[in-house]
UniProtKB/Swiss-Prot annotation:
It comes from Haemophilus influenzae. GO terms for biological process: DNA restriction-modification system; methylation. It comes from the Bacteria. GO terms for molecular function: DNA binding; N-methyltransferase activity; site-specific DNA-methyltransferase (adenine-specific) activity. Keywords: DNA-binding, Methyltransferase, Restriction system, S-adenosyl-L-methionine, Transferase. Its EC number is 2.1.1.72. The gene is hinfIM. Residues 275-358 form the RAMA domain. It is an enzyme of class 2 (transferase). Belongs to the N(4)/N(6)-methyltransferase family. It catalyses: a 2'-deoxyadenosine in DNA + S-adenosyl-L-methionine = an N(6)-methyl-2'-deoxyadenosine in DNA + S-adenosyl-L-homocysteine + H(+). This is Type II methyltransferase M.HinfI. GO terms for cellular component: cytoplasm.
Length: 359
């Protein structure tokens, strides 16, 4: 039975079948979905390391289906529910490997999801192909999709660029598998979950495509990596998991998380600057007619004119056209390019807009 208030679900783990539990969630109430569904690996026999030891791969009951027809039907059902509960401005990430990601992509396109990117998780420490019978499978693929082609969605471009040394973040992420202290073990010292994802992967997913206080849902919650990262970043989470042993691990893990997002994680870089025309700054005495503007190297470039434009030795232009001229570009943001000298210091022209707004 569907509930009407999403607040009833926030920061909880729902125990049960993912499709049935998804049906209880209100329409268009989720900002971001991360799904790590069964891969339908179809592994047979034992996997042996080169030294003869048995390798503990994915051989769980939840990854077993009779055939592709059953698997496809299952995926179509949970994806339909995800589309129903996703906000029009939301997005969904689905991760998979060569065994399933192409089938899932086909289903998602048939359901009118719009693929924004296929992001490659390049594993820096992949599990080798022990038999030497084919290439080492060193990556997984994530499909990042909006609800429909024309829908807007959250993408924190400036934040991700800043964290990538001021270069555009790319669609290939080189990250290690979940190992060491991060890998959760059971009482026998074995892996608590065979496909636990690293927090670094979910960090990029959640930070890039959600905002503080957004609702992040994971229909295959496992040991709670999605919830742990969401909570740490100041987002709300909802998990769905059918096995109590995983829920117990996830709940313990989540209790230990103390949200403490920094300014970057709170998306300070995504705040749009106030719209204040140059002429307004002149009228409010934040700028003077005839005042000199400089570039970052403290070279005098132009002076401010009465109408809010700027003038060099040749012509009068807007701050944007003037900065583009000196950079040999077609267009440029003049607010970021120009500086002025005030109180024995060079300050950015852009800072005046904030001073004016905050006065």
């Amino acid at each position: 039975m569907m509930k009407e208030n999403i607040n009833d679900f926030l920061n909880t783990i729902l125990k049960g079948d993912c499709i049935e539990k998804l049906k209880t969630i209100p329409n268009e109430s989720i900002d971001l979905i991360f799904a790590d569904p069964p891969y339908f690996m179809q592994t047979e026999g034992k996997l042996l390391r080169t030294n003869g030891d048995e390798f503990s791969g994915v051989d769980d009951e939840w990854d077993k289906f009779n055939d592709f027809v059953e698997y496809d039907s299952f995926c179509e059902l949970w994806l339909k529910e995800c589309k129903r509960i996703l906000k029009s401005t939301g997005s969904i990430w689905v991760i998979g490997s060569f065994q399933n990601i192409y089938r899932i992509g086909y289903i998602m396109q048939n359901l009118d999801f719009w693929i924004l990117n296929d992001v490659i998780w390049n594993k820096t420490n992949p599990v080798p192909n022990f038999g030497g019978t084919r290439f080492c499978n060193a990556h997984e693929t994530m499909l990042w999709c909006s609800k429909c082609k024309k829908n807007k969605f959250t993408f924190n471009y400036k934040t991700m660029k800043h964290l990538n040394q001021e270069k555009q973040e790319r669609s290939v992420w080189s990250l290690s598998l979940c190992t060491g202290k991060e890998r959760i073990k059971d009482e026998e010292g074995k892996k608590a979950h065979s496909t636990q994802k690293p927090e670094s992967l979910l960090y990029k997913v959640i930070l890039s495509s959600s905002k503080p206080n957004d609702v992040v849902l994971d229909p295959f919650f496992g040991t709670g990596t999605t919830g742990a990262v969401a909570k740490a970043l100041g987002r709300n989470y909802i998990g769905i998991e059918r096995e109590q042993k995983y829920i117990d691990v996830a709940e313990k893990r989540l209790r230990e998380i103390k949200p403490n997002p920094n300014d970057i994680e709170l998306l300070s870089l995504e705040i749009k600057p106030p719209k204040v025309p140059m002429k307004t700054l002149i009228e409010a005495d934040f700028l003077r007619v005839g005042q000199t503007l400089f570039d970052k190297n403290e070279n005098a470039i132009c002076i401010v004119t009465q109408d809010g434009n700027v003038k060099d030795n040749e012509e009068t232009l807007s701050i944007h056209k003037m900065s583009a001229k000196y950079l040999n570009k077609t267009n440029n943001n003049g607010w970021d390019y120009f500086y002025l000298f005030r109180n024995n210091n060079f300050i950015t022209l852009d800072s005046l807009r904030y001073e004016y707004t905050n006065q």
